[in-house]
Amino acid sequence: MASVFRSEEMCLSQVFLQVEAAYCCVAELGELGLVQFKDLNANVNSFQRKFVNEVRRCESLERILRFLEDEMQNEILIQVPEKDAETPLPREMITLETTLEKLEGELQEANQSHQALKKSFLELTELKYLLKKTQDFFETETNLGEDFFVEDTSGLLELRTIPAFMTGKLGFTAGVINRERMASFERLLWRVCRGNVYLKFSEMDTLLEDPVTKEEIKKNIFIIFYQGEQLRLKIKKICDGFRATIYPCPEHAAERREMLTSVNVRLEDLITVITQTESHRQRLLQEAAANWHSWVIKVQKMKAVYHVLNMCNIDVTQQCIIAEIWFPVADTRHIKKALEQGMELSGSSMIPIMTEVETKTDPPTFNRTNKFTAGFQNIVDAYGVGSYREINPAPYTIITFPFLFAVMFGDCGHGMVMLMAALWMVLNERHLLAQKSTNEMWNIFFNGRYLILLMGIFSIYTGLIYNDCFSKSFNIFGSSWSVQPMFRNGTWNTHIVENSPYLQLDPAIPGVYSGNPYPFGIDPIWNLASNKLTFLNSYKMKMSVILGIAHMIFGVILSLFNHIYFRRTLNIILQFIPEMIFMLSLFGYLVFMIIFKWCRYDAHTSRKAPSILIHFIGMFLFDYDDSSNAPLYGHQQEVQTFFVIIALVSVPWMLLIKPFVLRAKHQKSQLQSFTIHEDAVEGDHSGHSSKKTAGAHGMKDGHEEEFNFGDIFVHQAIHTIEYCLGCISNTASYLRLWALSLAHAELSEVLWTMVMSIGLRLQGWAGLVGVFIIFAVFAVLTVAILLVMEGLSAFLHALRLHWVEFQNKFYEGAGSKFSPFSFKHVLEGTAEE
C-alpha cells in the first residue's frame, strides 16, 4: 500500500540470454509490460545494429498490410478477433512473408487485370454509343446515299446544315470527349479551322466509370466533318490536346451496323470476364480481411521485439545477448517467471541469468495506477515526473483537486449536469473504448472521466453549501430568520413597509434570528437580500484564505515525510521546522484571528468587532496605538510581537545555519581523510617519492569531492527568499477561489435573469411555446458558457494552485518516467521512442 503514496522501488539488473532464446524472452517481457530496457547501443547508428535486417523485413510487411488495408477500404469489413494474436516465433516470419507477398502479388495482378478489363469495357461502351449516335445523325440529318463520301460534291447541298461553300470530297472524324471540355474544344476547333468544319455533338445519357480513379465521368459524342488532309491533321492534334478519344467509324451504314453488333457481343463477353475477375479479387480481399488484424498485431510485436534486441549487446562469442533492465522490485518473481517461459518456448536449455547492477544513475519513477487514479497521476506528471521514491502528490490530489475546483465552480445544478455526463462515460466505458476513437478532444475528456465525475460530485456538495442551483436557492429546512418580531416590537409598521425601498432585519431583536443556523449551507433568505453580495464576498474571501493556508501547511508537512524517508536529519531541523514556524506564526495566526472573530462576536457585539486587516498590518509594523480598533483578546500585543519575532528568527535559521553546518561537516571529513593518508604514508617505507604520490592521490580525491560553499550558500538564500515571499504571494493566490466563485455565481444569475426568467413571464399560448424555445437557448448558453468555458477556467486555476502553491512545498519533480516495454502500449500507439 505504501507504493500508492511513494513511487515503486526499482532495480537495475543485467540479463544474460542465449541468442536462440533472446527473442522469446523479450516477447514474454513485452506481454508482461513491467520492464524498461536500457539502450546499450546509444552511440551506434540505427543502420549498424545487429537486427536491422529483421526490422526492415517487418517494415516491408507493414507496407504490404497498408496496401491490403487500402484495397479493403470501403469494400470489405475487417474482422477483429476477440483475442489478440500471440507473438510469432522468429521462424514464422518466413511463412508470414510468403503468405503476404503471395497475396500482394495476386491482388496486384487481379487489380491490373481488372483495370485493363475496365478500360476495354469503357472503350467498347464509348464505341457502342458513338456508333448509335453516328447512325442516328446520318439518318436524321442527311439524305445522302452510300456513295456520298466517294463521289464529288454534286450532292453536298443535300446535307441541310452543312455550309454551302464547302466543296470537294468530305471526310469526318468521330470520337468521345469529357463533357466539361466540350465548350473549349468547340471554340478552339472553330478558331483554328476558321469555320471550315462542321461539328455535331450529343451528350451520352449513361454515366461512365473511370477505370483508374473509379469516379463517375460524363462524356459527349462528337462528329466533325471537314474537307482536306490539312484540316484532318489539325483536328487530330486538337483532339489529342483535349484528350478526346477518336474511334474508327465506317462510312457505310451496313458496316456501322455490323461493327455495332460485334461490339455488343464483345461487351457481353467482357462483362462475364470482369465479373469473374471481380469475384476472384473479392475472394482475395475476404481472405485478407479475415486475417489482417492478426497479421498487423504479429508484425508490430515482431518489430517491437527486434527494436528491443537492437538495444542489447552481444558478447564476443556471439552466443549470448546482454541486456540491462529497470523493473519494480516487487515484480521480480513475475519477471523471472516470464524469462523462464520464454526459455521453454524457444526450446533452449540455458536458464536466463539476472544479476543486480550497482549504479549511481537515478532510477526511473514508477507510480502504479488504475483507470481511476491514472487521470490524477497524469495531472501531477504534466508538471514534472517525481524524483525517485519521493512522496507522490497524486493520492492527495484525488480529493484536493476536485474540491478546489468545486469551490470555484460551486453550483449543484451545473454539478449535476457534469456528473451525468461523467456517469454516461463511466457506465459506457467498455463500449466507448472498443470504438478506439482518434478524436483528440474526445479522448482528453474520456481519459479524464473519473476526474470529471469527482468534480461533478464535489460541485454538487459546494453548491449545496452555497445553496446555489442555477443561481436559485433551496428552502428545504425553512429560514432561521423571521420578520414578525420586527412588527411586534413596533420597529416596522405598514407605513414604513410601504414607503421604504429597503428594509433591514435586526438580529439583535429577539425572535428575528432564531439562534439556530440553517442546518446545511447558507440560509436561503440571503437570496432576497440586497446585501447578499457583500455577505458572500466576505464569507468566500475568508474561506479562500483558510483553505489556502491549510493546503500550504499540508504541503509543508508532506515535506517532512520526504526528509524522514531519505534520512535528511539536517533538513528536518534546519528547513522543515523554521518553515513551519514561519508559516504558522504569521499565516496560521491569521486563520486563528478569522475563526476567533467569528466565534467571539455575535449580533449584539458585532458593532464593536475590530478589523482583522488593521490588526494584521499593525502586527508587522508593531503599531498598536489605534484606539478605534479594539483588540480581539487580552495580551494581544505581546502574543503578536512574539509571533513576529519567532517568524523573523526562522529566516536566518533557514538561511545561515545549514550552509555553515555543511561546511563544518566537509572540513571534518577532509581532516579525517588527511589523517588516514598521513598514517598510510608513515607506514610506508618507500621514502619521499611515496609521500609525493600519496599527496597527489589525496589532492585528486579532494578534487573529486569538491565542496563549493558559495554555491550552497546562494542556493540556500534563493530557497529562503522564495519560501518567505512565496508564503505571501501564494496566500494571495488562493483568493482566486473567491474571485472565480463570485464570477460563476454572477454569470449564472445574469443568465437566469436575462434568458430563463423571460420565458417564465410569458402568458397564454405564446408562453407555452416560448418557454420551450427559451429553455433551449438557456440550456445551450449554460453548457457553452458556464460548464465548458467557466469549467475550463476553474480547472486551469485549480491546476495552478496544485502545481505552484501546493507542490512547491515538497515536490521536486526532477525524475524520469518509467517507460516499460509493453505490447499493449505498442499496439495502442502510445509506446515512447
UniProtKB/Swiss-Prot annotation:
Stretches that traverse the bilayer: 391-409, 412-428, 444-473, 539-558, 577-597, 643-662, 721-745, 767-805
Gene Ontology biological-process entries: ossification; proton transmembrane transport; regulation of pH; renal tubular secretion; sensory perception of sound; synaptic vesicle lumen acidification
Tissue specificity as recorded in UniProt: Specifically expressed in kidney, but not in the heart, brain, spleen, lung, liver, muscle, or testis. Distribution within the kidney appears more widespread than that seen in man. High intensity staining at the surface of intercalated cells, with additional expression in the proximal tubule.
Highest taxon of source: Eukaryota
Region (Disordered): 681-700
Cytoplasmic side: 1-390, 429-443, 559-576, 663-720, 806-833
Principal subcellular localization: membrane
Pfam families, per the entry: V_ATPase_I
UniProt entry tagged with the keyword Transmembrane helix: yes
Compartment(s) of residence: Apical cell membrane; Basolateral cell membrane
Membrane topology: Multi-pass membrane protein
Keywords for this protein: Cell membrane, Hydrogen ion transport, Ion transport, Membrane, Transmembrane, Transmembrane helix, Transport
Any single Gene Ontology cellular-component annotation: brush border membrane
GO molecular function: ATPase binding; P-type proton-exporting transporter activity; proton-transporting ATPase activity, rotational mechanism
Subunit and interaction comment: V-ATPase is a heteromultimeric enzyme made up of two complexes: the ATP-hydrolytic V1 complex and the proton translocation V0 complex. The V1 complex consists of three catalytic AB heterodimers that form a heterohexamer, three peripheral stalks each consisting of EG heterodimers, one central rotor including subunits D and F, and the regulatory subunits C and H. The proton translocation complex V0 consists of the proton transport subunit a, a ring of proteolipid subunits c9c'', rotary subunit d, subunits e and f, and the accessory subunits ATP6AP1/Ac45 and ATP6AP2/PRR.
Family: Belongs to the V-ATPase 116 kDa subunit family.
Known function: Subunit of the V0 complex of vacuolar(H+)-ATPase (V-ATPase), a multisubunit enzyme composed of a peripheral complex (V1) that hydrolyzes ATP and a membrane integral complex (V0) that translocates protons. V-ATPase is responsible for acidifying and maintaining the pH of intracellular compartments and in some cell types, is targeted to the plasma membrane, where it is responsible for acidifying the extracellular environment. Involved in normal vectorial acid transport into the urine by the kidney.
Protein name, per record: V-type proton ATPase 116 kDa subunit a 4
Organism annotation: Mus musculus
UniProt gene name: Atp6v0a4
